[in-house]
């Protein structure tokens, strides 16, 4: 299959082409499309017009993502959105190519402004082309699209907010109560790739992305600002919420390189170190413990607190004893055969580094974040 993508270097185009390349190269096998049969033609505003002629002669499917969003003069809307679509369709007709054609429109096509009028004209042109040639056409009226690689301080509020907050730049919100309808770029790309196989989602004359998120402008800003504070608190978002998960990924894509990493507080003593990595309100705390050769750590028990230990490097011994009894349960552990050892409430426990030369590195999960006011930790040797 030969696929033509116009506007290939735009926001949606770049993401679509990237995933089509993954399919072609055998890296994305979840779409049911034979990648070795794909040829991808990329066309953009600075491409040679002769290339468009060649591509339109050979294409088996066309994604027309080219368009103008923010010209210097309003008259350019019609030229960029209607004019190019007309050129594209005329070129297909010249070669008698009636392959399916998808066009990227906007929910603003219903509005009476220069942008909406140009999009609506492009839609009607495509519908007329279908009636004239019998070609299958797919008109997608996208709401606001967000995700990685979207240009900030241009037409996308989400991209601007993510970029500016990530860079500690000011933002302006005129009305935080404005309701936004958004689709995520990965959902858009998945829908467009489904359309290749005739599995598009239709709603009357139009096609649509089935997953739409609705949230106020103020809610978006509040979430992004919370993301900015998370490295300092070691927290992570509520990823059970689909929109939050997608917005967090989008926010991270705008981080300046100097914020790709951030320091952790290592609690160091002569026995080794203990370092918290992630703290959550409902999934506990994740930490790394390092014990020096021959060192024993722990020797305490908890009423409610429970933990999971995984030795990832070194050779150690984990021991547990139920309070009020003398029987000791022992687990010899090492990084070459990882396993989870549960620290059970009501059992005093320790972890011993059996090596004389190597550190013992243990990944630890605890069901609650440490609270110095209620540590629930009581010393007692195993």
Segments predicted by a language model, with ranges:
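Conserved Rossmann-fold NAD(P)-dependent oxidoreductase catalytic core, especially the SDR/UDP-sugar
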Residues: 86-123, 130-133, 138-140
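Substrate-positioning beta->alpha
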Residues: 152-160, 177-197, 218-222
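Mid/C-terminal beta-alpha module of Rossmann-like enzyme folds, strongest
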Residues: 194, 198-265
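Double-stranded beta-helix
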Residues: 325-327, 352-382
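Conserved beta-loop-beta element that borders a ligand/cofactor-binding pocket
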Residues: 124-149, 162-163, 169-178
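A short glycine-rich, His/Asp/Glu-containing loop-to-beta-strand
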Residues: 260-299, 305
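N-terminal Rossmann NAD(P)H-binding glycine-rich loop of SDR-like oxidoreductase domains
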Residues: 1-26
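NAD(P)H-binding glycine-rich loop region in Rossmannoid oxidoreductase-like domains
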Residues: 45-83, 87, 91-95, 108-111
